[in-house]
Swiss-Prot record:
Belongs to the mitochondrial carrier (TC 2.A.29) family. Solcar repeats lie at residues 22-111, 119-210, 219-309. The keyword Magnesium does not apply. One of its GO terms (biological process) is thiosulfate transport. It is found in: Mitochondrion inner membrane. The gene is ucpC. Keywords: Membrane, Mitochondrion, Mitochondrion inner membrane, Repeat, Transmembrane, Transmembrane helix, Transport. It comes from Dictyostelium discoideum. One of its GO terms (cellular component) is mitochondrion. This is Probable mitochondrial 2-oxoglutarate/malate carrier protein. SUPFAM superfamilies: Mitochondrial carrier.
Length: 318
């Protein structure tokens, strides 16, 4: 991000250089690449989280397995590599969702900035929410396909979708359910993405800015680790309930009468709350944070390193 790469102690008061079209495009590309690289490492944890979120759905009964027991159960019944199902969709999701939200964050921030000075944190939150919404709209089709591929092993054999890959999944959803169905669950996904980007990108931006301004930290790996860990925790607490709702809506089959299991975000929220209680919204929180923590840390470290490589390449070709 444009404000991520400053080493000035007085970063709170230092004007930010005016952005160029090339630098703005670079942030879209770097954001997407960083998201894809981190997702390749954390996808099995995300699959584990999805399975845990779907436990006892609609009834509140049935096995309540923790992360370790669920991992052992999946390994025994389906094999460990089942956790890599949906990886192609996960990579496409990062290529669309993360590319858009990271790129838009810098783009919008540069537009609303006054006198080339860093934005107040409240404005960063608003920018984060706007860029998250844009990312969700672009990334929902891949996200929907990923959730279905991850959850397929939980369904009875006759109900499994058996998508070959993300593109096969998107094609079949469009053909069998209509193109609009690719945005099934977009509402909770959009809300989640708004809170995620505000909690994740804005928190990282602000935490790093304050750390550098204190004079006790430098723009190095230690600062990046602390800032990204803080951002991961804030984002996980804020978005876990929305992630559970999103997962359930995206994975929900039609009932025997042909109706959808959930009419929308608030219907899913109320049904889940009545049947399972508030704790249901934090089902799978441990693997959620175990995945979001490393993914957030890796994403921002990759962003920082890719920015360094970009600067070196620019000086090399001058």
């Amino acid at each position: 991000m444009s404000s991520f790469n400053t080493q000035n102690k007085n970063v709170l008061q230092t004007p930010i250089p005016a952005p160029t079209p090339q630098s703005q495009l670079k942030q879209f590309v770097i954001g997407g690449l960083a998201g894809m690289l981190s997702s390749a490492f954390t996808h099995p944890i995300d699959s584990l989280k999805v399975r845990m979120q779907l436990q006892g759905e609609g009834t509140g009964v049935g096995p309540k397995r923790g992360a370790l027991k669920m991992l052992v159960h999946i390994n025994q019944t389906e094999g460990f590599f089942t956790l890599y199902k949906g990886l192609s969709a996960s990579l496409l999701r990062q290529a669309t969702y993360t590319t858009t939200r990271f790129g838009l964050y810098d783009l919008i921030k540069d537009i609303v900035a006054k006198d080339d000075k860093p934005l107040p944190f409240t404005q960063k939150i608003m920018v984060g929410m706007l860029s998250g919404a844009g990312g969700a709209i672009v990334g929902t089709p891949a996200d929907l396909t990923m959730v279905r591929m991850q959850a397929d092993g939980k369904l009875p054999f006759n109900l499994r979708r058996n998508y070959k890959n993300v593109f096969d999944g998107i094609f079949r959803i469009s053909k069998e359910e209509g193109i609009i169905s690719l945005w099934k669950g977009c509402s909770p996904n959009l809300i989640r993405a708004m809170f995620m980007t505000a909690g994740q990108v804005s928190s990282y931006d602000q935490t790093k800015q304050l750390m550098l301004a204190s004079g006790y930290f430098h723009d190095d790996i230690k600062t990046h680790l602390i800032a990204s860990t803080t951002a991961a925790f804030v984002a996980a607490v804020a978005t876990s309930p929305l992630d559970v709702i999103k997962t359930r809506i995206m994975n929900s089959p039609k009932t025997v009468t042909g109706e959808l299991q959930y009419k929308g975000t608030f219907d899913c929220l109320s049904k889940t709350l009545r049947a399972e209680g508030f704790k249901a919204f934090y089902k799978g929180f441990n693997p959620y944070f175990m995945r979001l923590g490393p993914q957030t840390i890796l994403t921002f470290i990759f962003v920082e390193q890719l920015n360094i490589l970009w600067k070196k390449s620019q000086s090399y070709f001058k």
